[in-house]
Curated annotation (Swiss-Prot):
Species per Swiss-Prot/TrEMBL record: Malacoplasma penetrans (strain HF-2) (Mycoplasma penetrans)
Main location: cytoplasm
Region (G1): 19-26
CDD domains with a match to the protein in the record: EF_Tu, EFTU_II, EFTU_III
Region (G4): 136-139
InterPro entries the UniProt entry points to: EF-Tu_GTP-bd, EF-Tu_GTPase, EFTu-like_2, EFTU_2, G_TR_CS, P-loop_NTPase, Small_GTP-bd, T_Tr_GTP-bd_dom
Alphabetically ordered keywords of this record: Cytoplasm, Elongation factor, GTP-binding, Hydrolase, Magnesium, Metal-binding, Nucleotide-binding, Protein biosynthesis
Residues that coordinate or bind Mg(2+): T26
Protein EC: 3.6.5.3
Region (G3): 81-84
Name this protein carries in UniProt: Elongation factor Tu
Lineage, opening ranks: Bacteria, Bacillati, Mycoplasmatota, Mycoplasmoidales, Mycoplasmoidaceae
GO MF annotation terms: GTP binding; GTPase activity; translation elongation factor activity
Region of interest called G2, as start-end residue ranges on this chain: 60-64
Gene Ontology CC terms, in alphabetical order: cytosol
Amino acid sequence: MAKQKFDRSKAHVNIGTIGHIDHGKTTLTAAICTYLAKKGGAKAMKYDEIDKAPEEKARGITINTAHVEYETENRHYAHVDCPGHADYVKNMITGAAQMDGAILVVAASDGPMPQTREHILLARQVGVPKMVVFLNKCDMVSDAEMQDLVEMEVRELLSSYGFDGDNTPVIRGSALKALEGDATWEAKIDELMASVDSYIPTPTRDTDKPFLLAVEDVMTITGRGTVVTGRVERGTLKLNDEVEIVGIHDTRKAVVTGMEMLRKTLDEVKAGDNAGILLRGIDRKDVERGQVLAKPGSIKPHKQFEAEIYALKKEEGGRHTPVLNGYRPQFYFRTTDVTGQITLDKGVEMINPGDNTKITVELISPIAVEEGSKFSIREGGRTVGAGTVTKVIK
């Protein structure tokens, strides 16, 4: 059978299932696909097909993630589900699977557990704007008061981490019963997807964001000027636009006098394009790898920030020993390494391999960073951790 063509005119949203181990994240993912397949909006997936998630690499870190896609009447979704807790942590911190929203799965039989809290905190730190709650295994908890209690607990937990606990939709259901085709519980999947459709905001498309290109290479074309090459991370750029060169040195302005991609000249480049940008009045020595070209005023160079990081385990190629206060590794942002010093959070004595925690970083030279910027932590050329900037200090 030919792969189903998805309707690209629908709004596209990236979501994922999060929550404590064995609360039913993968079963719910399978139930959503199987239910929507009946409506022609997905390919039915069995639990095992999702659970044997393939390995992928992001920022030098191996992560197991299952990707499924489906559509409702209003939207097209890419949905991620991770088999293990560590995969979630790595996924969220590296941004390997971008999440515009999440479905938090909580078993009514257990209530919120440690990983429930951790996933909510991580979602907050990495900027997931909203989530919908699926109270699972309600077929096993017939006492409505017990379900009410768990729901109240989840709402309070969401509020304590800065989400809108009062207005977050909470759907009570049974992923397993829905997957088995029980109509009563299938209706709950319908209710869940209606909530996801309405409550999780449609993200701003990358092309509508302010222009940014990470500089990979710089060359001179005799008689024409300096050409900067790299991938357009977001936004669009047109001929004769003004850009700023940000990071490492003082910020400078330049005018775009030419653009090309795959040896063809263009009038416009947009998010996702690998392009060469010709800049007027800029010397070869004025630009270097690691800087960015950006829409004027849209991003500033910073040296100090707070971040949420994950330290690789020894088996993942990470360090064998803990990191102490004052540790000075390289921080790899976009296309370059910059040395920086780590200050641990109050009360934290060390970071052990496999931990995820909050740190403060002071770089030796300023880099174009903003809240949500992703980076790798490297030592002697190998990746020992990954992080997300959660707050810029200076």
